[in-house]
Amino acid sequence: MAYSIKLDSFEGPLDLLLHLIDKAEVDIYDIPVAEITEQYLATIDKMQELQLDVASEFVVMAATLLSIKSKMLLPKKEEHVFQQFLDMDVDEIDPREELVARLLEYKRYKMLAENLREMEIGRNQVFTRPAENLSPYVREEDHTVTNVTLYDLINALEKLVKKTKEKEPMTTVSRDEISIKDRMTEIRQAVRSGGMVRFSELFTQGATRTEIVTTFLALLELMKAKHITCVQNQLFQDIIICENGTEGAHTDGL
């Protein structure tokens, strides 16, 4: 009758050591090296019996544990001579000290990784919805024509750039670049011919980032020269661009 043995997967030798220490319910600051070493070697033997690849780092840790075990089994007098032979500090406190420090550091990182994983799971369970148009809930008397600030223009530009990202054309057609000065002339002509023009109408469908930025800078230059005025009739509505001094006539009823 066939049977299978399941072994826990470990990310490395320190992960395996922590598992054995937790399973044995021993103090990490006072590791019973002989007992843990036997369990560690037995686990590696099982991995090899199951024809699992045992990374070299597991073997290195096994050698480290055996070295610590041998030091702790030596009588104090012989240990003193052994340390002198290896030119080591005879006042070494505990051969387990370095291993304990590595285990504690690994345990901290493991706990942090687990916390981040839980936060990611929690965030994936949160769903947000897009912003709503709140203009129907604004009091009628607040729907006054106001001068548009640079902040309002930047917000409108960000929305256009976002739409450009979402609707990138499948093919790109090269166009002749237009200067800011030429774009200023085009905007003034559009305003004069129609009496006014909406902000969104200045940006044709499929406009490139360069064209969007050029148009935006042209608008700023025209506002700076006081050739045009930008107004907004209601909150969240499109920005209206008209000749300076005519904004009231062109925004009534919009």
Curated annotation (Swiss-Prot):
Which compartments is it annotated to reside in?
Cytoplasm
Q: Which of UniProt's keywords are assigned here?
A: Cell cycle, Cell division, Chromosome partition, Cytoplasm
The answer on whether this UniProt entry bears the keyword Ribosomal protein reads: no
| A GO-annotated cellular component | cytoplasm
Location, primary (coarse class) = cytoplasm
Keyword Transport appears in the UniProt entry: no
Per its UniProt record, what InterPro entries does this chain match?
Answer: ScpA, ScpA-like_C
Q: What subunit structure does UniProt give? A: Component of a cohesin-like complex composed of ScpA, ScpB and the Smc homodimer, in which ScpA and ScpB bind to the head domain of Smc. The presence of the three proteins is required for the association of the complex with DNA.
Q: What does this protein do?
A: Participates in chromosomal partition during cell division. May act via the formation of a condensin-like complex containing Smc and ScpB that pull DNA away from mid-cell into both cell halves.
Q: Family membership, please give it.
A: Belongs to the ScpA family.
Spell out the protein name for this chain.
Segregation and condensation protein A
Organism this protein belongs to: Brevibacillus brevis (strain 47 / JCM 6285 / NBRC 100599)
